[in-house]
Structure formats: C-alpha cells, structure tokens
Amino acid sequence: MEQKRNDSIDFAKGFLMIFVILGHIVQGTIEDGNLRGVIYSFHMPLFLFISGYMINLNKLIAQPVKDVFSKYWNRMLKAWLLAYVIFTSYLLLREPTIISVIGLTYSPWGHLWYVPTLFLYILLCKFLFGKTNLIVSYSVLILLGIAWNYVIQTTSINVSHWFDCSKLPYFALGLYFRNHLNSEKFNKPYIVAPLLYVPLYFAFVSLPFKTFGLGTALLLVGVIILYFYPALKNDTMPKSKVLSYIGKNSLYVYLWHQAPILLLVNYVSECNLTYYYIISFALLFLFILYIKLRKVA
C-alpha cells in the first residue's frame, strides 16, 4: 500500500522557500538587524531541520554507497551541477580574474552551498550511524558543529562552504526527531536537553545573526518542539496548494530564484533601489500568480 504524502512537509518547505526568496531580495547586511537578519535567523535552520527529518536512517544505512550516490545524483546533484556551472560562468564572465576563479573554486557562490553540504551531511550520517552507536554518532555531529562554529567565531579563517558544518546541529535535530525520539534511552531528560539546547546555542552565537543570541536560539527550538515537529509528524499544518506546489518543487525554485535577483542587483539596484524593489516584488507576485492559475495548483 502506497504511503500517503505528508502535505505539511510540502507546505513547510514552500513557506520557508518564500522567505528564502525574500531574504535574498532584501538588501543590506544581516548584521544590520533589519528584516533580512530576522529572516536569516530562522529560514535555513528550519530548512535543515526538515532535511534531517526526512532522512530514514535505517534505509540510508542499508543502501550501498553506490546506490546513495545514484539516488541523490538524480534527486538533487544533477540539477545543482547545472545551476553551479551557469551561475559560476556568469560571475566569472563579469569578473574574469584569477582571484574570482580561486574564490569560486574554494567556496561556491551564494546559495549554492546548500546541496553539496546536505549531501555530505547524508554521507557523514550513513558512515557514523552505520559504524558506531547512537551516542557516539550524535556526539560527533554535535561536536563537529560546535568546533566548526568555534573556528568561525574565534579566528579569521575563511571557511569553505562546500561542507558547511555550522548548521549541522539543526540537521541532527531533525534526524533525531524522525528516527530516535521514541527511543527509550534518548527520552531521558538529561540526554535530550543538551542535544536540543547546547548545539543550537553554539550555532547561533557564532553565526552572522549572533546578535539575536541565546534568546532566539531557545525561541526557535521552542517553536520546533511545540509546533513545527508535531505539525510535521501529524500532518496538521495549514493547507495551501500554492505553497505545497512550491514545496514539492523547492529544489528548482531554490536553485534558480537567484537568477533574476542577481541580474536586478547588478543592473538595476545600483542605479535605482526603488525600481529594484518594485521589479523584484512584481516578479515574486507574478510567480505566485502563475502557480495559482496552474491547474496542478
């Protein structure tokens, strides 16, 4: 019997995808504490929580590495590679310098970090949970996230984003909620509390939006525990055909939404920021209207 699709996961991904787009449209730095900073404080952490929540560890561990590569090549890596080549080529054509070549080789541009990072998270979890016990596996994920954030916070090292472990705690949290929340040994409060709070604290205090501090971290984990996780598990999130459609196609929306924004930033915002916002939000409105008018929506 075919398992019913969880519409709440699609809704959540679509909802967060709108904020991903808004976060890239809004100009300014995250440190300014403006709307962009608020958006960045929750949209990618929750996206990574969902990504971890969608992983079935037993199936992942049982699959040969070759099959894992094949599965994710068709599911996301092939589409990502095309986007990476096109965006990188465009950026190098605009600035054909050796510094640009080195920079874009060392670390992918903008939003292109997510897919390779997610794939490496998955491979790491396959190895850890397949070779070690739960305590060791989760400890490694947490400590790796903490160590990565410590380096970012205390040194001037420009860490590559091909494998960005700074957000690993959120992925691990989703993984835990999906696969081990009902495990007796992990339901003990003195084990669960550090798993939930400590990694998120270290993640928040070292990221660009660290000014939101511990309060934001605890607020976000509270939202996850009290609403986000129960709503995903019980499929009780609001129904929206438009957001669900965006959620189902979130990979392609994520990979290509930056194309018009990048062109507008390069050719419009430098001349007239008002025109930039008018065109950007008009395009976003037309995108949503197009989905609304489609029969599949």
PLM regions: where:
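Membrane-proximal cytoplasmic C-terminal regulatory module of class A 7TM GPCRs
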Residues: 294-297
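Alpha-helical transmembrane segments
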Residues: 10-21, 78-86, 138-144, 192-198, ...
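Transmembrane alpha-helical segments and their boundary/interface "anchor" motifs
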Residues: 41-48, 58-112, 117-121, 192-193, ...
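Functionally critical transmembrane alpha-helices in membrane proteins and complexes, commonly lining
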Residues: 6-59, 76-84
